Amino acid sequence: MAHNQDASSPSGMTYRDAGVDIDAGNRLVSMIKRSVASTHRPEVRSDLGGFGALFDLDTRKYQDPVLVSATDGVGTKLKLAFLTGKHDTVGIDLVAMSVNDLVVQGAEPLFFLDYFACGKLSPETAATVVEGIATGCRAAGCALIGGETAEMPGFYTEGEYDLAGFAVGAVDKHKIIDGRHISPGDAIIGLASSGPHSNGYSLIRKLVLGQSGPGLEADFNGKPLGEVLLTPTHIYVLPLLELAKTHAIHGLVHITGGGFWENIPRILPDATGALLKRSCWQQPEVFNLLQKLGNIAEDEMLRTFNCGLGMLVIVPATQADSALAQLRAAGEQAELVGEITSCKEGDARVVIL
């Protein structure tokens, strides 16, 4: 049967009648081509719009390469984007959550794919989100090589969408960072976060938007609180990859859901613990506000939020000073915040004084 693109002769129901606008999807692809191209790496072997994306791994850069993958979303932080109409930062969050998980294993992020799902596609909104994704990819040095836009009428509330991201990286097998070399006496360096990142937003929304909450328009140091809470997740990739070339990184901890109590033990070998000193880093004011709004106990704060530290770097004590200097020179706010300790069975693995 011949395909006739003349839509002027109605002959029955169309996909658009069901709520799916293929033309809007095509407009979106045209709108994002420049942003996607800005993330290009020489290993990319395909253009946007194919059935799949091709990436030619340059094995000459590795002795024994291992691929590392990660996937994540932005969670209910998206609700703040819907309420404020500010969609330019959540794409950065999407990339950050996955690439930060790659670098903690020593992997260089190579490429990224996204999934954007909505009830009715707004090409303008989606393009703004993808521009943020491209910004995140450039910050991490990875290519945005593909994605999926799913328009599903009746499935999502009008004006809302969901995001998922998928990242793949590579690391030489002998350079994998998995915590096996962590030992008592190692130094723990904390890298400052840009805010709550992408965790704890169900609680944040309850505190800020609840009956007695200040609301998103409330002034916070000269900015609307909603804008402050949408500050994108910090991407630590490039400074840490450079640090790994010059220092023996024994472990890296991405402080995400579960906070300090849940994430630090994931990297600790048996018979070791972590001692952190709260006085060694400053908790940003936004966390002080949240703690005050909910009268949140300190233990719960440390379980829910990063409290100002988005990444922990564990190095031999003899390398702590030079690691601090290099990280600061790279633009990171880095502080010596603790040390690795010996730990007996039954002892607390993480102690924060």
Swiss-Prot record:
Pathway: Purine metabolism; IMP biosynthesis via de novo pathway; 5-amino-1-(5-phospho-D-ribosyl)imidazole from N(2)-formyl-N(1)-(5-phospho-D-ribosyl)glycinamide: step 2/2. It catalyses: 2-formamido-N(1)-(5-O-phospho-beta-D-ribosyl)acetamidine + ATP = 5-amino-1-(5-phospho-beta-D-ribosyl)imidazole + ADP + phosphate + H(+). One of its GO terms (molecular function) is phosphoribosylamine-glycine ligase activity. InterPro entries: PurM-like_C_dom, PurM-like_C_sf, PurM-like_N, PurM-like_N_sf, PurM_cligase. PANTHER family: TRIFUNCTIONAL PURINE BIOSYNTHETIC PROTEIN ADENOSINE-3, TRIFUNCTIONAL PURINE BIOSYNTHETIC PROTEIN ADENOSINE-3-RELATED. Belongs to the AIR synthase family. This is Phosphoribosylformylglycinamidine cyclo-ligase. The gene is purM.
